[in-house]
Structure formats: C-alpha cells, structure tokens
Amino acid sequence: MRTKINALLAILLIFVTTVSCDNYLDLRPQDGIVREEFWKTKEDIQAAVIGMYSSLLKSPPGVTVPTGGTDYTMPEYLFMFGEIRGDMVSPGTYVTTDQRDITTSNILSSNDITSWHVFYRVINYCNTIIDLAPAVIDKDPTLTQKQLNNYLSEALAVRAYLYFTLARTFKDVPLKLTATLSDKDNFQLPTSTQSDVLAQVAKDLALAEGYAVTSYGNTASDKGRITVYTINTMQTDVYLWMEKYPEALAAATKVTESGKFSLIQASSNWFTRVFAQGNSSEGIFELQYTTANLNPFYDMLFQRPEFTAAPNVFEGVFGIDYVNSANQDIRSDRCSLVAGTNEIYKFTGLNTDERKALSECDTHWFVYRYSDVLLLKAEALAELGRGAEAVPIIEEIRAKRNAINATSQSVDPANKAQVIDYILAERAREFAFEGKRWFDVLRNAKRNNYERLDILLNMAVTNAPADQQQSILAKLRDPNSHYLPINVYDLYTNKALVQNPFYK
C-alpha cells in the first residue's frame, strides 16, 4: 500500500512540475528529483497511466491556462468543439461572449475557446510514459514486456485521440512526439499539416492495437481504459476522415464481430443504464466521473446554463407523434433534453423523471459508444457503394431506440447521398450533445473536394440570427474557416507558428 501511495504522490508531483511552464505547449521538463525518484517500478508506470486518465477529467491542482482565460476541462472543450458550431445547441443565459461568437462564426484568434493547452498538457503526459516507461523493464524484474506494451498502448491511443481531435478542430497543429525532458528542448515547433497529423495518428493506433488488451477483467476498466476495441473504433473514425473506406470498414468489423458489445432495447430504465450509470454493454470508451470527481456539466448546462438545446431539436430532430403522444423516441424528452425548456439533460439526469443532485452528478463523458462504430461502419459501407448493407444498420438502431415514423426516411440504397444524409440524421439523434455533430457534418461535407458543402452550409444557418445568415454563409464557403484559429498567445510565444490563412 505504501508503494502505491508513494507512486500516486509522485505522479501528482509530476503533474504540478510538468504544467507550470509558460511556453506555448504548456510543458515543463522532467529534470531533477521527480525523474530521479520515479520510473523505477511497474507501479510507477501504473501511477503515470492513472494520472494520464485523471488529467482527461480535469486539470491537476494549481494548474491554469497560461492565456489567463477559463481553464475548461477536456470534456468541456470536446463538447464545445463538437457542438457549438453545429445546429443542435443555442446560447444559454450564461453564455460567454467568446462562446457566442463561435456559434455565429465571428471567431477571432483572441477567443478563449481556441486555447489548445489542455490538449498539449495531456499529450506531454502521454509522451512521458512512451519515452520513459520502457527503461523501467531493466530496473523492475517483475515487469514483463507484455505489461509494458499494455501500458504503452494506452498512452499511444490517448495521444492519438488528442491529436485526432486537434487536427479536426484546428487542421494544422504542432506535432510533438517526444516528452519535454530538458530546458534545452525546442519549444518553437511549426505546425504539421492535417494529413501528416492524421497519418501519425493512424500509425500510433496501429502500434497500439498490437500492444492492447482485450479486457482488464472488470467492467469499469474495460469501459474507462483503452482496450483493443477502443483502438479499433478510433481507427474507424480516423480512416473515415482520411477517406480510407476499406480500412475503416475492416476496423469497424473487428468491433462488431467481437461479441463484446450490444445495443440495449428501449425501456423505462434505458436512459439510466446507458447514461446515468454508464459502463453498459453499449459503452466502448467513457471518461469515468464519480461522486468524488463530478462532471462539469451540472453548472455548464443546468445551474448556470451556457448552452441549451436549439429550439428545433425536439421536433425537428426527434420528431413528435401527434396521434399518440406516448409514442416517443427513447433518446428524446428526458434523455437528450427536456421538452419545453430545452435544457440539455443527458449529463445531469438520473432517470426519465428525476435529475441528479449536484453531489451525485457523476455521468460519464462518452467518447465512443457501440452505436457510434455501427453508424461509422454504415458510413464506410455507403462510401464503398454498399448502401444496401448500410441501411439495415440504421434501421436496427432506430428499432432499438423506438424512433418514430416521422423521422424515418425512404432512401434508395444505391443513392450514396441519400444514405449518408440518413446516417447523419440518425447520428444527430443518437449522439445529441456528445461533441460529435460539427465533426460528423464536416467529415461528410469535405469529401471529394467539398462535394457536399451544402450540408455544412445548411446546418450552419439553421439556428443563426436572420441578420447574420448571409455573413455566416460567406465565411463558410472558405474551407479554412471550418477550423479554429491558432490562439494569439501561442502565436506570440512560438514564432514558428503560422496562422490559418482565413484568420490572417
């Protein structure tokens, strides 16, 4: 027990010393006592990996963003990056000016939301594990190569996911693959192209796949830590962005044929099982909040709401059965949102009647669920001209969710655009407010040299103020505007960076 406590204290010390530097990547060298006393046993590696996951939930004590702005948690950034430029959220009573500006595509490089420091902070934790853990095998005879590889797979996959998110959000970003271990490290790193970043992500995931476990022996770890199925799901997502459809289909099939996951039939306790409790048979990778470490959304979405569901979501996305009001999509009222108030309910609800108390708001952040890989698989099939195989996947999910007839679409399986539009509509229902909407539409809009720019433009003006719609459309016709600018602080502290041309 003393060894474990010492290891956990050591990793907390690493957190404090690693993130207090002023350079643009928010990294600090591992010189001195921390590095000398750590990285000696497999327990040290385990503590570092636990710390890596903990940093995905919230920042270590005493750590702030160097820009002086709001120190959002990773899930808050993931929510904002994936939702507030889309068509399913609206500004709430307590929305900030910076948040509102992003919803209307009025984005400046000084915008608080464009900070990437929390991402690079965790990336450095991953890099530190990847660089320093291998040497422990020569110091601890109880550490096996298989155990080491398992830990490395987790760090590689988390790093890959973070870079994947950055590439989808900012397009071209600095690609740092080694830990910051010395003051002599070069902090003036230029950006790498989006294609190069995605290629590195795919490379990391391929390596991680060979190292990963299929199970840790308990449900919480299987859902809260990286497994081979998490990696396969990430690969599916990444390959779709890279327009490598056979590879995406192959990765998705590894998950769907594993027998490890299943959809749960709609019932009175479906919401509680899947979301309020989490770690259900539908979960693939969930960030594990607990009552001792609450999620940030009780304040952000309920007590002082910065965002609400857009007015069109309840009827326009989920539909209403005007003949039988009891006939309702299980994902609709008192799951994704509260009808009438448009409160976003998914991360604060206990069941379909009762909201969690603040002290109980431990709903997870859902990085990937089984329905995600199913619909990504359907997307790959559609792009491969196999729409007849894609449509039944959509219908299977709709049946499990009790989707109503009003949202059903009659599509020609041979018409790729129709099938893709049906998939996007179903993804909107299935992943409402889970940080996916903007990325889903952008991924499909940009294919074949923006052949489907129309779906992005239509989405962008759905809830836009009438007097701003033409301005928004004019901006979004430039593909560079689909990505956020590099924050002005980072441009000032790293002269090697070059701003996105749209924001110059």
Residue ranges and their predicted role:
Residues 58-60, 257-346, 419, 431:
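Extended ligand-binding clefts on enzyme/binding-domain cores
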